[in-house]
UniProtKB/Swiss-Prot annotation:
Enzyme Commission number(s): 3.5.1.16
Residues the entry annotates as binding Zn(2+) 2: 112, 145, 355
GO MF, one example: acetylornithine deacetylase activity
Binding residues annotated for Zn(2+) 1, in chain numbering: 80, 112, 169
Family: Belongs to the peptidase M20A family. ArgE subfamily.
Xref: PROSITE patterns: ARGE_DAPE_CPG2_1, ARGE_DAPE_CPG2_2
Cofactor needs: Zn(2+); Co(2+); glutathione
Keywords per UniProt: Amino-acid biosynthesis, Arginine biosynthesis, Cobalt, Cytoplasm, Hydrolase, Metal-binding, Zinc
Organism (species): Erwinia tasmaniensis (strain DSM 17950 / CFBP 7177 / CIP 109463 / NCPPB 4357 / Et1/99)
InterPro entries found in the cross-reference section: AcOrn-deacetyl, ArgE/DapE_CS, Bact_exopeptidase_dim_dom, Peptidase_M20, Peptidase_M20_dimer, Peptidase_M20A
Catalytic residues as annotated in Swiss-Prot or TrEMBL: 82, 144
Protein name: Acetylornithine deacetylase
Amino acid sequence: MKTKLPNFIEIYRQLIATPSISATDSALDQSNETLINLLGGWFRDLGFTVEVQPVPGTRNKFNMLAKSGSGAGGLLLAGHTDTVPFDDGRWTRDPFTLTEHDNKLYGLGTADMKGFFAFILDTLRDVELSTLKKPLYILATADEETTMAGAKYFSESTALRPDCAIIGEPTSLKPVRAHKGHISNAIRIQGQSGHSSDPGRGVNAIELMHESITQLMALRNTLKERYRHAGFAIPYPTMNFGHIHGGDAANRICACCELHMDIRPLPGLTLSDLDGLLNEALAPVSARWPGRLTVGELHPPIPGYECPREHQLVQVVEKLLGRETEVVNYCTEAPFIQQVCPTLVLGPGSIEQAHQPDEFIDTAFIKPTRDLIAQVVHHFCHH
């Protein structure tokens, strides 16, 4: 049965050749259905049972869950099927043709992170799945690069409770156990325009925004004083004012002003707590100027994430790799998968190549990644 499976490079080639771009712009956004069916077929060839799940609220996107073995616990290996869009002018190769050159495999999704599924499939062809004492699950998600809709839907809808999960994002095979979250908001003030010669007849949105920013800067200090995590290089939540726009002329009272800002919360500071703090900070402005201040999301929020250092998963992986787990500054699906079971982020390829023209993965990762997958499957599914 396993002979049906193409070789490692051919699997990789077909994954890269199947476009699965996710983008907020519907003109660039693509369904991942073809890729999901390709993966589903290969996992069935290995003897897995495969379930394909439409992801609600998306443009024809799907998750795939493959399962081998039965009982409680076990291991979940997870990854996303989508890639970012590419800038045609900056790529020197065809993004959808796997190109091997100078010990590197080039192509869109080679590192981030379609390639991870090639590593899983290639490793599992040599594993006798009938001997597993605990189940092995493979999760392929949709829309990680935009809304994380696939991972969110899985975590909200699944009844599965594996012992642990590994998400194969490109961490250069360094295990990651924590990262900050990310929220980005638009603060909008609706004033009342008028001629600057008669200030009393208008409501100046820029002045109200000044009041709002004063409140937000006080919140920034509160966050810095109240929340600490020594693991991070910047050990407190950050707040940034990134873009502001308002008004149209020096002699007009500004009718509208909008500020775009972001906050990067530490693990343990929940999105609802953060929302509460934000609303509390802006409440005095809203009270003074009813109906004039609104807060809207620019992107779906991502919570912070942390897998406890003392968890068995952390201990086992640190021992296998001979290195300690790290914390990072980028966001992944880990906070959502962590709601299902303890989760680490660990995979081949470098984050430096993700979202870059001429994206590649170094072939030096091939053997250690195969070894690692075989070891974690053996440890969590055979014992």
